[in-house]
């Protein structure tokens, strides 16, 4: 998710029965005021399936909120700067290299590529309007993938795999 989409999430956007999260708004800050708008593009409006462990974490988090209603924003009062500051704090404590909030989105997409999901599936999950955006940004060739291709072709050549 984009940071603005995350900041705009409301309790009603989480469907625990279906295991989904609906992205249909984005939050931006203009002249010190929070402004809820439509997401970046029309294709950014989407429903994301989330795994059980994440659902449980979200339930636990919601239980910590005060006076929860369907329209309660999950991260009310938080800003992009807040998340950036918390990331910076975590980076210093852990000693890892500097990463940004957007790096998490990029890492998620790259992991999905490595797991073998198609660019079309990944584009839908990320809310990209064009699959080419996903391909150009996240589907760059890795040496690891190239080695796997060569290994598999070798197995086909040796008759260890059918290739089908």
Sequence positions of predicted segments:
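Short, contiguous acidic/charged loop-to-helix segments that flank catalytic cores in large enzymes
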Residues: 35-45, 74-79, 95-103, 140-141
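Phosphate-coordinating loops and pocket residues in cytosolic domains that bind phosphorylated ligands
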Residues: 8, 16, 136, 140, ...
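Extracytoplasmic/periplasmic beta-strand context in beta-sandwich domains
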Residues: 19-21, 46, 72-73, 136
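Short, charged phosphate-coordinating catalytic segments
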Residues: 1-27
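C-terminal secondary-structure termini that scaffold catalytic or DNA-interacting sites
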Residues: 18, 31-33, 37-45, 49-54, ...
């Amino acid at each position: 998710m984009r940071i603005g989409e995350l900041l705009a999430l409301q309790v009603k956007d989480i469907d625990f029965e279906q295991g989904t999260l609906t992205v249909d708004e984005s939050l931006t800050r203009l002249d010190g005021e929070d402004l809820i708008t439509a997401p970046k593009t029309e294709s950014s409006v989407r429903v994301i399936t989330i795994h059980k462990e994440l659902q449980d974490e979200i339930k636990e988090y919601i239980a910590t909120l005060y006076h929860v209603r369907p329209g309660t924003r999950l991260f009310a009062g938080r800003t992009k700067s807040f998340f950036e500051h918390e990331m910076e704090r975590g980076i210093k404590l852990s000693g890892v290299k500097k990463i940004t909030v957007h790096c998490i989105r990029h890492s998620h997409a790259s992991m999905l590529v490595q797991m073998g999901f198609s660019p079309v599936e990944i584009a839908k999950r990320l809310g990209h309007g064009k699959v080419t955006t996903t391909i150009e940004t996240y589907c760059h060739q890795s040496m690891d993938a190239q080695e796997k291709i060569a290994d598999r072709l070798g197995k086909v050549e040796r008759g260890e795999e059918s290739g089908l």
